[in-house]
């Protein structure tokens, strides 16, 4: 049965990538259908009950700057907020929030259920309608065909999903959900490179069986920060509660090493490679055998939940072994496991087969986002869903495209890494992956991206007004401070000198004075003659960072200008690299396989040398491809 409701975009999957994808295309104005196997699990946190962290928090802020829902949802559902690296520079500071699972899912649903242009339908997708190498729709398990101009696949770990607890394995997309085996088989029949990855989750523990008195208490920050640039004064956080910290010990490690042969990972049952930066407890004990203990964060699953998430104890060991090693840990001596931990392996598709828009190179109008591309994490998934669906929506009746770059966002770093380097293990974002960290800060994500969001129609009128007002306030106040001079013999100078290490000897602007480490905006405000009455903390923060890091920021902007030349030089999709004399067979093979869209993208493919880029540039100039 064919249902042609005139959909522009179909999004398959209601996880974190799917939610951002469906919301983005609908906000732009595309008639959007979200297909999910279960409406009740839309926005569900399948693994850890938290949003953000190092690198990940930056992604959430960028999603928010583009009008996404993740930051607002966690502001509505967060039960503990912390700024990580708060004593370090602004480039590496990151927000992290503990979530109430129930409240988070409720928040997500409240945001998308009120979204215009968005329909939601419950059914699994088993097949795609593909005509002349172009996707035209999706076919559900019950035989319904929905036609659309674009399809975005955000299917998480459901493609060929297999759950492992010890040597017991069963098919599943996650605990309690069936996998998408028919869709996995269909995708394998298409000309994509496919492989397997693995991830895992720890056992859940009944909080009533835990002794918190012997654990370290971890409180959130006060005042409580907000994730969204648009939440303050509009959204009230739920009640805030602490997390706890405990540690494994030698007994824990002995129990695990004595039973490694029973682990699905170590017995050879699992083919897929697991996440390097979120390893199972078995991996940690083996890889870091010299460590006497490993830190475990004991995280509540919600204000009204009795379940605890022991972050750091992901496992594929048998249930009996899980019980034994859990009870060897301080505070868990009488722990009752409510849900066993498990590992899950699933299909992913080589992201080098994608364009920077996340459209596939082999099937037109088909986009991949999230774990299907080899990433791990809610934040990485949401970022990809956003970009994929933006491009699906804006290219419906034109050849328009937009994608972030390494110079303007961590989302750009994420996508560029995936499409140029691919991945052999679940990819996680870190600040260390970015070249321009001082420019790509959490605090200025809106200043970097919200202008584009306004242009694309992604922000509500209210959020647009908030952003424009903030941006104008920053510009106006910085200009004023750069044009306000203080002479060394004035009363203002004498008032200032109580904050300075030495007397003023020359005339300085307020902006230059703010560059000094001993001066901040609040001290300048104490000088009544200056009439500095600004009260907006977010605006003040941008003024201070602009002053104190001005030299470094200028240097990074110059570096960006140098690399921008290559990024602007497009390579035609049908370019014949064999005509370029001097390219090695390895370089020729890689360029032909990956079909980079720009010289900049080509330069970042592993194995592509600067000499090869020079040869390519010279040839393209000679033949008129670039000027």
UniProtKB/Swiss-Prot annotation:
It is found in: Cytoplasm. GO terms for cellular component: cytosol. NAD(+) binds at residues 274-288. Pfam families: GIDA, GIDA_C_1st, SAM_GIDA_C. SMART domains: GIDA_assoc_3. GO terms for molecular function: flavin adenine dinucleotide binding. InterPro entries: FAD/NAD-bd_sf, GIDA_C_N, MnmG, MnmG-rel, MnmG-rel_CS, MnmG_C, MnmG_C_subdom, MnmG_C_subdom_sf. GO terms for biological process: tRNA methylation; tRNA wobble uridine modification. Its cofactor is FAD. Keywords: Cytoplasm, FAD, Flavoprotein, NAD, tRNA processing. Its main location: cytoplasm. FAD binds at residues 13-18, 125, 180, 371. Belongs to the MnmG family. Homodimer. Heterotetramer of two MnmE and two MnmG subunits. NAD-binding protein involved in the addition of a carboxymethylaminomethyl (cmnm) group at the wobble position (U34) of certain tRNAs, forming tRNA-cmnm(5)s(2)U34. This is tRNA uridine 5-carboxymethylaminomethyl modification enzyme MnmG. It comes from Francisella tularensis subsp. holarctica (strain LVS). The gene is mnmG.
């Amino acid at each position: 049965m064919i249902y042609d409701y005139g959909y522009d975009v179909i999004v398959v999957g209601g996880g974190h990538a799917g939610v951002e994808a469906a919301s983005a295309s609908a906000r732009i104005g595309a008639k959007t259908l979200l297909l999910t196997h279960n409406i009740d699990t839309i926005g569900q946190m399948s693994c850890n009950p938290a949003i953000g962290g190092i690198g990940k928090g930056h992604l959430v802020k960028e999603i928010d700057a583009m009008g996404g829902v993740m930051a607002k949802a966690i502001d509505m559902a967060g039960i503990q907020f912390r700024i990580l690296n708060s004593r370090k520079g602004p480039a590496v500071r990151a927000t992290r929030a503990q979530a109430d699972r129930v409240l988070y899912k409720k928040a997500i649903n409240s945001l998308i259920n009120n979204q215009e242009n968005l329909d939601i339908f419950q059914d699994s997708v088993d097949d795609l309608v593909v005509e002349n190498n172009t996707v035209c729709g999706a076919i559900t398990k019950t035989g319904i065909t929905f036609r659309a101009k674009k399809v975005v696949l955000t299917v998480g770990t459901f493609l060929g999903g297999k759950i492992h607890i010890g040597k017991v394995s069963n098919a599943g997309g996650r605990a309690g959900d069936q996998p998408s085996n028919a869709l996995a088989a269909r995708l394998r029949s298409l000309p994509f490179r496919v492989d397997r990855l693995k991830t895992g989750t720890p056992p859940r523990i009944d909080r009533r069986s835990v002794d918190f008195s012997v654990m370290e208490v971890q409180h959130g920050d006060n005042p409580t920060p907000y994730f969204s640039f648009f939440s303050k004064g509009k959204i009230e956080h739920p009640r805030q509660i602490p997390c706890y910290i405990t540690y494994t010990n030698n007994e824990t490690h002995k129990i695990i090493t004595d039973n490694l042969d029973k682990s699905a990972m170590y017995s050879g049952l699992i083919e897929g490679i697991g996440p390097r930066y979120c390893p199972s407890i078995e991996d940690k004990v083996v890889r870091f055998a010299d460590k006497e203990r490993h830190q475990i964060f004991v995280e509540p699953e919600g204000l009204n939940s009795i379940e605890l998430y022991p972050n750091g104890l992901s496992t594929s060991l048998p249930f009996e072994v899980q019980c034994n090693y859990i009870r060897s840990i301080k505070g868990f001596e009488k722990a009752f496991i409510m849900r066993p931990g498990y590992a899950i392996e699933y299909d992913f598709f080589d992201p080098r087969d994608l364009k920077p828009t996340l459209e596939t190179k082999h099937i037109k109008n088909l986009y991949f986002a999230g774990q299907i591309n080899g990433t791990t994490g809610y934040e990485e998934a949401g970022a990809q869903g956003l970009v994929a669906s933006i491009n699906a929506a804006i290219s419906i009746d034109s050849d328009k495209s937009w994608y972030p770059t390494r110079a303007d966002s961590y989302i750009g770093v994420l996508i560029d890494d995936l499409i140029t380097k691919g991945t052999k293990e679940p990819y996680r974002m870190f600040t260390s992956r970015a070249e321009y960290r001082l420019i790509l800060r959490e605090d200025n994500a809106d200043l970097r991206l919200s202008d584009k969001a306004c242009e694309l129609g992604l922000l509500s009128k209210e959020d647009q007004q908030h952003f424009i007002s903030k941006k104008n306030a920053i510009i106006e106040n910085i200009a004023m401070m750069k044009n306000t001079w203080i002479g060394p013999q004035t009363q203002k100078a004498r008032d200032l000198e109580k904050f300075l290490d030495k007397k003023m000897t020359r005339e300085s602007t307020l902006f230059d004075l703010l560059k000094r480490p001993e001066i901040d905006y609040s001290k300048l405000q104490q000088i009544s003659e200056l009439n500095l009455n600004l009260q907006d903390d977010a605006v003040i923060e941008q003024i201070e960072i602009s002053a104190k890091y001005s030299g470094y920021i200028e240097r990074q902007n110059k570096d960006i200008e140098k690399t921008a030349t290559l990024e602007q030089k497009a390579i035609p999709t049908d370019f014949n690299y064999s005509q370029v004399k001097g390219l090695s067979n390895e370089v020729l093979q890689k360029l032909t396989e990956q079909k980079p869209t720009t010289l900049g993208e080509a330069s970042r493919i592993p194995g592509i040398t600067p000499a090869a880029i020079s040869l390519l540039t010279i040839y393209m100039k000679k033949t008129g491809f670039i000027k």
